């Protein structure tokens, strides 16, 4: 193993000089002995003259010129397999839950090629989430990729936690959760939520939170993905949750600037599309097993045309768009049924009835959207009888799209509901057909099935 020495430290970027005949490869891991602390660096560029430019995977506090650096001669490797289940690890796969060693049998490098074209498999099976608006409007495919788009504070993490709770309990497979640049408090809440739901022994948790250096946040998504790939290659159907994919892009922007690359649009790194592609192309299903991924995507300033969310859109099968306008009406989950889409919403995949009900719901809501201006200026009385009926049904549909969540029980005080797809379709079909025109609209707010709405109406 070749050794070199640090010649420059600028924040998270460290330049290391090696002998000319032993220069480490790009993406190799280097180890710095800094007193009791061991710091891992990852080679990003070879500058010539035996000098390599690296990104630190931990804090560079206390580093100084002249410190000895060892080339480990392989990329960062992390534990994979069943030993990782129920544990919290950092970007290097080291345990951070005070429960001793992982005790893994195998370690894999975090940089791996994506599966080859002939190994890929696609699936038409639907994944039932138990959340009405998602199952109806933007159904998820098993082995597909789903993005949860939303600005600050509209409920991405709560939706993500509800999905994990519902799918992990209903679906008996393994899950991997990568917390990329999110709040440590949320990571803590999430751990206890999994523990209380008795699904912790089926989830591997990898955290690189907001307080970590950019190198750490940039690589932690790959660490989680590598663990998911191992489960997939064993022939399992695995779930990969990433919260938040935007922070992965942001960490890439920070690293890119530190490495001296010229920024592109809005200050993002010039390699934005490539970095996103490298990650997303590995999140895929093969003939041996599948990875179904759910990714939260922060939308800066609620602008979906920002380069980061816009680049992410291209890779997804289903997009769930969370809207601030809907959240302000108190309707949670604040999913925008007119903006959310799924490739699976096709009569050949979901069946004709599901397709017709979903499109019918969207057309009623769209018509209501158009009538809002008239109502604001002239009032409801100026509408035709037909339009009054559309508005009344649209408002019921809008409220029926809300649902109490299990993970939000402590805030709402009402028990969570898991609604089967069959009940969801039946409920919305009934509202559209006018079976519930006699019920007041508040009966449809925060209930599970349509029967609950009927019961609630009796109490009003």
Curated annotation (Swiss-Prot):
ATP binds at residues 150-157. GO terms for molecular function: ATP binding; ATP hydrolysis activity; proton-transporting ATP synthase activity, rotational mechanism. Disulfide bonds: none annotated. It is an enzyme of class 7 (translocase). SUPFAM superfamilies: C-terminal domain of alpha and beta subunits of F1 ATP synthase (SSF47917), N-terminal domain of alpha and beta subunits of F1 ATP synthase (SSF50615), P-loop containing nucleoside triphosphate hydrolases (SSF52540). It is found in: Cell inner membrane. Its main location: membrane. The keyword Membrane applies. It is a peripheral membrane protein. GO terms for cellular component: plasma membrane; proton-transporting ATP synthase complex. It catalyses: ATP + H2O + 4 H(+)(in) = ADP + phosphate + 5 H(+)(out). Keywords: ATP synthesis, ATP-binding, Cell inner membrane, Cell membrane, CF(1), Hydrogen ion transport, Ion transport, Membrane, Nucleotide-binding, Translocase, Transport. It comes from the Bacteria. Its EC number is 7.1.2.2. F-type ATPases have 2 components, CF(1) - the catalytic core - and CF(0) - the membrane proton channel. CF(1) has five subunits: alpha(3), beta(3), gamma(1), delta(1), epsilon(1). CF(0) has three main subunits: a(1), b(2) and c(9-12). The alpha and beta chains form an alternating ring which encloses part of the gamma chain. CF(1) is attached to CF(0) by a central stalk formed by the gamma and epsilon chains, while a peripheral stalk is formed by the delta and b chains. Belongs to the ATPase alpha/beta chains family. PANTHER family: ATP SYNTHASE, ATP SYNTHASE SUBUNIT BETA, MITOCHONDRIAL. Produces ATP from ADP in the presence of a proton gradient across the membrane. The catalytic sites are hosted primarily by the beta subunits. This is ATP synthase subunit beta. The lineage of its organism: Bacteria, Pseudomonadati, Pseudomonadota, Gammaproteobacteria, Enterobacterales. The gene is atpD.
